[in-house]
Amino acid sequence: MSSRNLLYSSVVLFLVLFYCHGGPLEDRVRSTIQEVYKNCRKDKNPGVIVSVVKDGQNVLTEALGVKDKISGEAITTDTLFGLGGISALFANILIAKKNAEYAEMDEDTTLRNLFGNNKLFEKSKLRSRYATSLDVMAHRLGFKNTPHLFLDDTVTRGDPVIQRISSMKPRGRFRDSFYYNELTYSILTTIGERLGRDSWENLVKNEIYTPLGMAKSKFFTTLDPSTVDIARAYKEDDGSLFPVPFEFLKKWSSLCSTTCVLSSANDMSKFMNYLLGQRKPSWTKPCVTGPRKFTLILFDAI
């Protein structure tokens, strides 16, 4: 069971670049979305949020369905949903931003140099020597997905998860195969935290959420669900939907690799506008002091 299947069982989040703004066409789009949800997804997704953006503007936001099947309370465009694999985008942006703060460092810097370890992957000399953070982002390390390791209490952030990954045996060839792997993405969590000298959640909040005005967005790992407007996750099994306990989701998301982010239709429209180049957050301003010198002190060998 992947995080994508688990978290998307409660939400289908559409972030669409659509060429319409106002008038009958927008009404037809909204009507089509409502009909598709009613006829195709209502039995699979109790709640759905939709955002449509164009030219830096939020053209349409729509909230359909309910937050949970028991209360029947309607969702809104500010209701939080688990984003599953979209969390990886936040990890990638954070790495790119932190890389820009250090001289002689980018996404092609080898993990060997970052971690000061020439045997980072015990089963592969090739990966140990040449693997980069870009290889992690592109899922081209060739490791079969092992998401259930998220439930292992010994696999925590930092050295423990890196050590577990280092002992894994590759399934595919390096840079010549695509194996989606959520666990290896936690390498990026570790890099981000060590470069930023803070928790992944604080870094994403301070350097992505706040500059983009994503005031409602949260994290499974730090959230108290009783204090926010949040949709319940459901998992389909044998034709029926079953609620997923929040504590399970919190544990499942603890590595903050591809599972951690909670956001709303309104906030994600801001994020989508940024991805499309229509929003320039404060971090795009030139660095006044210049990049810092990269040092292996941040990455003690495991």
Swiss-Prot record:
Keywords: Membrane, Signal, Transmembrane, Transmembrane helix. One of its GO terms (cellular component) is membrane. Residues 1-22 form the signal peptide. It is a single-pass membrane protein. It is found in: Membrane. Component of the organic matrix of calcified shell layers. The chain crosses the membrane at residues 75-95. This is Gigasin-6. It comes from Magallana gigas (Pacific oyster).
